[in-house]
């Protein structure tokens, strides 16, 4: 089964499937799954010496305002393999804009059936303060050395804003 056949989730927006493109703490390489072939491509080598503070991926069958599927960060006890799919629930969203427009990053934790470690996290403010700071710092800085690219972080949104981002992106993709 190709990645294009992975559903958006079991019960949107609270129970989603995230296709992982970049493992947490990996080398500074931006990977993207080609939505037509399902292949994992190297998008670019990041100019900054930074790594993603959580696993990074997307929800299939969604379309964010930047024209890509909704982006999701997933903290886990261990880095996940690119191309793997993880069942999650959203807890918040980092609101930001870049040179291509709105570029929100949903933060989601693994579903309770995978691990009980995140059961106490109901909202982004329940995440460790250091992890939130690392995520924000990463996205404020990761394009700093790339000519013509920029990012403006506008702050954090709660679980309800994350849920709405997922629903809006799912509806946008159906049009």
UniProtKB/Swiss-Prot annotation:
Annotated GO CC locations: cytoplasm
Binding site for Mg(2+) 2: 71
EC number: 3.6.1.1
Gene3D superfamilies for the chain: Inorganic pyrophosphatase (3.90.80.10)
InterPro entries referenced in this protein's UniProt entry, alphabetically: Pyrophosphatase, Pyrophosphatase_sf
Annotated catalysed reactions: diphosphate + H2O = 2 phosphate + H(+)
Keywords for the protein's UniProt record, in alphabetical order: Cytoplasm, Hydrolase, Magnesium, Metal-binding
Binding site for substrate: 30, 44, 56, 142
Binding-site residues, Mg(2+) 1: 66, 71, 103
Localization per record: Cytoplasm
GO biological process: phosphate-containing compound metabolic process
Main location: cytoplasm
Highest taxon of source: Bacteria
Cofactor requirement: Mg(2+)
An example molecular function term from Gene Ontology annotations: inorganic diphosphate phosphatase activity
HAMAP family attached to this UniProt entry: Inorganic_PPase
Entry similarity comment: Belongs to the PPase family.
Role this protein plays: Catalyzes the hydrolysis of inorganic pyrophosphate (PPi) forming two phosphate ions.
Assembly behavior: Homohexamer.
Protein name as annotated: Inorganic pyrophosphatase
